[in-house]
Amino acid sequence: MAEKRNIFLVGPMGAGKSTIGRQLSQQLNMEFFDSDQEIEKRTGADISWVFDVEGESGFRLREQRVIDELTTKQGIVLATGGGSVKFRETRNFLSSRGIVVYLETTIEKQLARTKRDKKRPLLQNADSNRMILENLAYERNPFYEEIADIKVKTDDQSAKSVAFNIIRLLEEI
Protein backbone atom coordinates (compact mmCIF):
# COMPACT_ATOMS: atom_id res chain seq x y z
CA MET A 1 0.00 0.00 0.00
CA ALA A 2 2.39 2.65 -1.25
CA GLU A 3 0.08 5.63 -1.27
CA LYS A 4 -2.25 6.16 1.67
CA ARG A 5 -5.72 5.31 0.45
CA ASN A 6 -8.71 6.07 2.59
CA ILE A 7 -10.08 3.11 4.52
CA PHE A 8 -13.76 3.16 5.45
CA LEU A 9 -15.11 0.62 7.95
CA VAL A 10 -18.75 -0.41 7.62
CA GLY A 11 -20.79 -3.03 9.41
CA PRO A 12 -23.37 -3.49 12.13
CA MET A 13 -23.18 -1.98 15.59
CA GLY A 14 -20.93 -4.05 17.79
CA ALA A 15 -18.77 -5.27 14.88
CA GLY A 16 -15.79 -3.34 16.26
CA LYS A 17 -15.54 -0.53 13.71
CA SER A 18 -14.30 2.12 16.16
CA THR A 19 -11.91 -0.16 18.05
CA ILE A 20 -10.49 -1.78 14.92
CA GLY A 21 -10.36 1.61 13.19
CA ARG A 22 -8.13 3.00 15.94
CA GLN A 23 -5.85 -0.04 15.66
CA LEU A 24 -5.64 0.32 11.88
CA SER A 25 -4.88 4.02 12.05
CA GLN A 26 -2.07 3.41 14.56
CA GLN A 27 -0.55 0.55 12.59
CA LEU A 28 -0.74 2.46 9.29
CA ASN A 29 0.08 5.87 10.79
CA MET A 30 -3.14 7.35 9.39
CA GLU A 31 -5.59 9.80 10.93
CA PHE A 32 -8.66 8.17 12.52
CA PHE A 33 -12.21 9.50 12.48
CA ASP A 34 -15.43 8.08 13.87
CA SER A 35 -18.53 9.54 12.22
CA ASP A 36 -20.61 9.24 15.42
CA GLN A 37 -17.93 11.03 17.46
CA GLU A 38 -17.72 13.76 14.82
CA ILE A 39 -21.48 14.29 15.03
CA GLU A 40 -21.29 14.46 18.83
CA LYS A 41 -18.41 16.94 18.63
CA ARG A 42 -20.26 19.18 16.18
CA THR A 43 -23.64 19.10 17.94
CA GLY A 44 -22.27 19.18 21.47
CA ALA A 45 -24.69 16.36 22.31
CA ASP A 46 -24.58 12.59 22.31
CA ILE A 47 -26.10 10.47 19.56
CA SER A 48 -29.06 9.40 21.72
CA TRP A 49 -30.04 13.04 22.24
CA VAL A 50 -29.78 13.79 18.50
CA PHE A 51 -32.00 10.75 17.81
CA ASP A 52 -34.54 11.88 20.44
CA VAL A 53 -34.73 15.46 19.16
CA GLU A 54 -34.34 15.01 15.40
CA GLY A 55 -35.44 11.40 14.91
CA GLU A 56 -33.50 8.85 12.93
CA SER A 57 -34.03 10.71 9.64
CA GLY A 58 -32.58 13.94 11.06
CA PHE A 59 -29.63 12.04 12.47
CA ARG A 60 -29.00 10.27 9.14
CA LEU A 61 -28.92 13.60 7.30
CA ARG A 62 -26.30 14.90 9.75
CA GLU A 63 -24.39 11.65 9.35
CA GLN A 64 -24.49 11.92 5.56
CA ARG A 65 -23.07 15.47 5.66
CA VAL A 66 -20.28 14.42 8.04
CA ILE A 67 -19.37 11.39 5.93
CA ASP A 68 -19.42 13.48 2.75
CA GLU A 69 -16.97 15.91 4.34
CA LEU A 70 -14.69 13.32 5.97
CA THR A 71 -14.42 11.12 2.87
CA THR A 72 -12.91 14.01 0.90
CA LYS A 73 -9.86 13.96 3.20
CA GLN A 74 -6.82 11.93 2.15
CA GLY A 75 -5.19 9.08 4.03
CA ILE A 76 -7.78 8.52 6.76
CA VAL A 77 -9.42 5.60 8.50
CA LEU A 78 -13.13 6.24 9.07
CA ALA A 79 -15.41 4.18 11.29
CA THR A 80 -18.98 4.76 10.13
CA GLY A 81 -22.23 4.32 12.00
CA GLY A 82 -24.03 1.02 11.38
CA GLY A 83 -26.91 2.72 9.58
CA SER A 84 -24.81 5.08 7.48
CA VAL A 85 -25.30 2.84 4.45
CA LYS A 86 -29.06 3.45 4.31
CA PHE A 87 -28.76 6.33 1.85
CA ARG A 88 -27.46 5.56 -1.66
CA GLU A 89 -25.59 8.88 -1.75
CA THR A 90 -23.65 7.97 1.40
CA ARG A 91 -22.82 4.55 -0.05
CA ASN A 92 -21.57 6.31 -3.18
CA PHE A 93 -19.32 8.63 -1.12
CA LEU A 94 -17.80 5.63 0.61
CA SER A 95 -17.35 3.36 -2.41
CA SER A 96 -15.92 6.06 -4.68
CA ARG A 97 -13.53 7.73 -2.23
CA GLY A 98 -11.70 4.86 -0.60
CA ILE A 99 -11.50 1.18 0.22
CA VAL A 100 -14.57 -0.11 2.04
CA VAL A 101 -13.98 -2.83 4.63
CA TYR A 102 -17.09 -4.66 5.82
CA LEU A 103 -16.63 -5.95 9.37
CA GLU A 104 -18.93 -8.93 9.76
CA THR A 105 -20.13 -10.30 13.08
CA THR A 106 -22.89 -12.52 14.44
CA ILE A 107 -26.02 -11.35 16.23
CA GLU A 108 -24.73 -13.14 19.36
CA LYS A 109 -21.49 -11.13 19.34
CA GLN A 110 -23.43 -7.92 18.71
CA LEU A 111 -25.65 -8.63 21.72
CA ALA A 112 -22.63 -9.40 23.92
CA ARG A 113 -20.70 -6.32 22.79
CA THR A 114 -23.59 -3.86 23.07
CA LYS A 115 -25.48 -5.08 26.15
CA ARG A 116 -24.05 -2.50 28.57
CA ASP A 117 -23.76 0.34 26.07
CA LYS A 118 -26.31 3.07 26.77
CA LYS A 119 -25.24 5.09 23.70
CA ARG A 120 -27.11 2.91 21.22
CA PRO A 121 -30.44 4.64 20.53
CA LEU A 122 -31.83 1.72 18.53
CA LEU A 123 -31.14 -0.73 21.40
CA GLN A 124 -32.88 0.79 24.38
CA ASN A 125 -35.33 -2.06 25.01
CA ALA A 126 -33.30 -5.09 26.12
CA ASP A 127 -36.26 -7.47 25.65
CA SER A 128 -36.37 -6.94 21.90
CA ASN A 129 -32.70 -6.28 21.09
CA ARG A 130 -32.19 -9.62 19.31
CA MET A 131 -35.17 -8.98 17.04
CA ILE A 132 -34.03 -5.40 16.40
CA LEU A 133 -30.53 -6.58 15.44
CA GLU A 134 -31.95 -9.30 13.18
CA ASN A 135 -34.19 -6.76 11.43
CA LEU A 136 -31.30 -4.31 11.03
CA ALA A 137 -29.12 -7.09 9.58
CA TYR A 138 -31.85 -8.01 7.09
CA GLU A 139 -32.17 -4.36 6.06
CA ARG A 140 -28.50 -3.31 6.05
CA ASN A 141 -26.36 -6.36 5.22
CA PRO A 142 -27.14 -6.13 1.47
CA PHE A 143 -25.87 -2.53 1.52
CA TYR A 144 -22.65 -3.51 3.31
CA GLU A 145 -22.14 -6.29 0.75
CA GLU A 146 -22.86 -3.92 -2.14
CA ILE A 147 -20.03 -1.51 -1.33
CA ALA A 148 -17.48 -3.82 0.33
CA ASP A 149 -14.05 -4.15 -1.25
CA ILE A 150 -12.93 -6.39 1.62
CA LYS A 151 -14.95 -8.49 4.08
CA VAL A 152 -13.52 -9.54 7.44
CA LYS A 153 -15.15 -11.52 10.25
CA THR A 154 -14.49 -10.01 13.68
CA ASP A 155 -16.12 -12.56 15.99
CA ASP A 156 -13.29 -14.47 17.63
CA GLN A 157 -10.29 -12.22 17.08
CA SER A 158 -8.74 -9.31 18.91
CA ALA A 159 -8.97 -5.86 17.34
CA LYS A 160 -5.22 -5.99 16.76
CA SER A 161 -5.36 -9.26 14.83
CA VAL A 162 -8.34 -8.06 12.75
CA ALA A 163 -6.36 -4.90 11.91
CA PHE A 164 -3.33 -6.99 10.85
CA ASN A 165 -5.63 -9.15 8.71
CA ILE A 166 -7.11 -6.05 7.04
CA ILE A 167 -3.63 -4.68 6.31
CA ARG A 168 -2.64 -7.99 4.72
CA LEU A 169 -5.79 -7.93 2.55
CA LEU A 170 -5.19 -4.29 1.59
CA GLU A 171 -1.77 -5.23 0.25
CA GLU A 172 -3.44 -7.72 -2.10
CA ILE A 173 -5.65 -5.15 -3.84
Curated annotation (Swiss-Prot):
Co-factor requirement: Mg(2+)
Pathway assigned to this chain's UniProt record: Metabolic intermediate biosynthesis; chorismate biosynthesis; chorismate from D-erythrose 4-phosphate and phosphoenolpyruvate: step 5/7
Catalytic reaction annotation: shikimate + ATP = 3-phosphoshikimate + ADP + H(+)
Keyword line: Amino-acid biosynthesis, Aromatic amino acid biosynthesis, ATP-binding, Cytoplasm, Kinase, Magnesium, Metal-binding, Nucleotide-binding, Transferase
GO cellular component, one term: cytosol
Free-text comment on the cofactor: Binds 1 Mg(2+) ion per subunit.
Major subcellular site: cytoplasm
GO annotation terms (biological process): amino acid biosynthetic process; aromatic amino acid family biosynthetic process; chorismate biosynthetic process
Function: Catalyzes the specific phosphorylation of the 3-hydroxyl group of shikimic acid using ATP as a cosubstrate.
Oligomeric form and interacting partners: Monomer.
Entries under HAMAP family matching the protein: Shikimate_kinase
Family as reported in the entry's similarity comment: Belongs to the shikimate kinase family.
Protein name, entry field: Shikimate kinase
The organism's taxonomic lineage, starting at the top: Bacteria, Pseudomonadati, Pseudomonadota, Gammaproteobacteria, Enterobacterales
